[in-house]
Design a protein with these regions (language model features):
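Glycine/Thr-rich phosphate-binding loops of Rossmann-like dinucleotide-binding domains
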Residues: 15, 71, 115-116
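NAD(P)H-binding glycine-rich loop region in Rossmannoid oxidoreductase-like domains
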Residues: 44-83
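SDR active-site strand-loop-helix element
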Residues: 8, 28, 61-65, 105-111
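N-terminal Rossmann NAD(P)H-binding glycine-rich loop of SDR-like oxidoreductase domains
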Residues: 2-23
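Rossmann-fold cofactor-recognition segment
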Residues: 32-49
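Conserved Rossmann-fold NAD(P)-dependent oxidoreductase catalytic core, especially the SDR/UDP-sugar
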Residues: 89-130
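Glycine-rich NAD(P)-binding loop of the Rossmann-fold in SDR/ketoreductase-type enzymes
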Residues: 76-90, 129, 133
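Conserved glycine-rich Rossmann-like NAD(P)H-binding loop of the short-chain dehydrogenase/reductase
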Residues: 24-34
């Protein structure tokens, strides 16, 4: 039996490319999908409220919520943290609180999450983390 995958943040830069490659991926986000995508869509009202996922069947997550608009992010000192770290932290807390069994969470971000002073290449998930703005 194939694992069900959800993609959170489907309307940004990478989301549509993933969804076009695999119509079975369930899209989860605040904004509706473009009309050329046939993936099923689940709306969430906020990038910090994942309760609409409570009754969904999924084992894998592609997490794409974030922002790389450097002009806006540089003008608002805390916005990069809010857009690129809080949503992921909230989602991981949601998974823990609901005791959801997940095979993988793949996160794409514009922020460096690993400690740049301790990072070793190639980088894996066991590297020391130190997200910074």
């Amino acid at each position: 039996m194939a694992s069900k995958t959800i993609l959170i943040g489907p309307t940004g830069f990478l989301g549509p490319a993933f969804l076009k490659m695999d119509p079975s991926i369930l899209a989860v986000g605040r904004s509706p999908l473009s009309s050329n995508l046939t993936n099923e869509f689940v709306e969430i009202s906020s990038e910090l409220d994942f309760s609409p996922l409570d009754n969904l069947d999924y084992e894998n997550v592609i997490f794409l919520i974030g922002s790389s608009d450097h002009k806006i992010l540089n003008a608002h000192p805390t916005m990069a943290f809010e857009k690129n770290v809080l949503a992921l932290s909230s989602f991981l807390s949601y998974l823990k609180a609901t005791r959801r069994k997940i095979n993988k969470v793949v996160n794409f971000t514009t922020m460096l999450q690993y400690d740049s002073m301790k990072i070793k290449i190639p980088c894996d998930e066991k590297q020391p983390r130190n997200p910074s703005v």
